[in-house]
Amino acid sequence: MRKQILFVLFSLATLSIHADEGMWMLTDLKAQNTVAMRELGLEIPIEEVYNANGLSLKDAVVHFGGGCTGEVISSEGLVLTNHHCGYGAIQQHSNVEHDYLTDGFWAMNRDAELPTPGLTVTFIDRILDVTDYVNEQLKKDPDPDGVNYLSPNYLGNVAERFAKAENIEITPATKLELKAFYGGNKYYLFIKTVYSDIRMVGAPPSSIGKFGADTDNWMWPRHTGDFSLFRIYADKNGKPAEYSKDNVPLQVKKHLKISLAGVQEGDFTFVMGFPGRNWRYMIADEVEERMQTTNFMRQHVRGARQKVLMEQMLKDPAVRIHYASKYASSANYWKNAIGMNEGLIRLNVLDTKRAQQEELLARGREKGDDSYQKAFDEIRSIVSHRRDALYHQQAINEALVTALDFMRIPSTTELVTALKSKDKELIKEAKLKLKKEGDKYFASVPFPDVERMVAKEMLKTYANYIPAEQRINIFEIINSRFKGSIDAFVDACFEHSIFGNPKNFEKFIKKPSLYKIGYDWMVLFKYSVTDGILKTAIAMKEANQNYDAAHKVWVKGMMDMRQEKGMPIYPDANSTLRLTYGQVLSYEPADGVVYDAHTTLKGVMEKEDQGNWEFVVPQKLKELYKSQDYGRYGKNGEMPVCFIVNTDNTGGNSGSPVFNSKGQLVGTAFDRNFEGLTGDIAFRPSSQRAACVDIRYTLFIIDKYAGASHIIDELSIE
């Protein structure tokens, strides 16, 4: 055992030097990264990874739903992504009678595949560096406020101009996205094709796809079969189209080949996907601000809400299904905030940031260039001035906006205008519109008792963190009319407000009045929260007035410093297609503890706890384990489940394909480890890992567990 541990530690020491920080632009791969990737083990030409003039692996990687990544794994448009990426769709199709969240879902033929309105899959057709063109337009166009260089609206107009000038073909399904990179020092145009007829094909039960749930989230070792399957449909000509029974599976230009060989410690891997956001160019003051505002509020406010929700979800299956997606979404970044703050402290990231910024400032002094010092001083001043406003803004957003469904009550503005006009036709139209919106609202909140509990907890949590003199003005009413009792105020909202219950709403619609609207508790609460949002937004806007310009200078300095050292550069993540590469690698999270890079089905059985919903194991999976009926997916009598790689991932990489050195699919990225959550701000190769579902476990569940061998038949397995 001692020899094994020493061997692993030696491997860590020798292999960790290959950890490669960077969410690389595909357009820069050939010039910046080819040599390093080949040294690590890439066996295919870089043009097979990304080719601006032909098909490549890039063409099988899709943006799934706008927030995740997916990969096309068959010639007929079959898309593989994570279970948690498809979770909203699975919930959408679930009810107490057909509980696909609990039982899973498998379409045994094409007719059984379930249309999923609102879900899209997007292909990236072309990526163009348009920096020179954008800079030319910026010089020509009026810009009195100096904000065009980062304005999405302005850049959208420039994208249309460029497409017209270059005769780029635009169809109804084409989307142009022009984004600023490096704080506005470079610009890239992404030409996309969006498909909107997406159908659910398969998903394991949550006891597989969400095994470990909140306890294991952001942790390693993992034993989660976090995958789901969808299919892209198009019209008979292969063009994007809205749902129609006449649509057919898309015949794609490129799909991925799958390897059953698996990966071993030290093997080269690379990942493509759409990482959402990170902040590698922050100064130390900004990191500290993030810890004390955004992360602090996420941890404490979401934790309080989730406790209330979970208590009710465990009591009633209908409540569980309704709140499942909301709870999962909330819990995801609740735990992320906890892990990030702990990691930033443990790894002394603030000290590292201070050393980096001092290096750049010294470089500027040596060159007689004070622009970096001015930018640095400006950013520090801004952070100091906006701190209180940001803290309050985060409290409002977390506790009173995101957490409370009754913040989404319909607007009464149109009815108020009509009532003031005393025009009967206008009043009639406004009533009909409000009736429709009200019915939709009540359908979205079928469990008012749960909403009431959450509201009480959230208002108390908000009040706990915000001093009385700074709170939104609804607290003046709570203090004067309800003697400071938040419980009494919330009860009054649900018992007496127009939108408190359907009975009150129906009564109001029959006989609306300005008086009732003007003194309605829920309406007043919404106005008060909106006022708080506006005030904090104004304060933030005033404080941030010069931030973007200073940040652009600071980022340019960091770019130049890296390039002078011969180091490749990459921009912060912004939901655009990137590539990251590294190795399958175990790690040492603490003294005397070594985590292997692989997990197996044995670990699922070891974690089983039938009394804990997070660790329930399906009976059939236990039977397959007992009989070791793994088929061609097992190895040496074991069933691989997950593995880790030291690639540079973040949110948005969920569902990303993990490739081996030959460009074959070997896994699907789904999470990061707790020790590596600092990665959004500072990459630490010794501790940062991405957790991936082994493709062999995915296929084993589809084939052996679900009996959906027809899905296996359409894959290209090597």
Predicted regions and their residues:
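Terminal presequence/propeptide segments associated with secretion/organelle targeting
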Residues: 2, 16-718
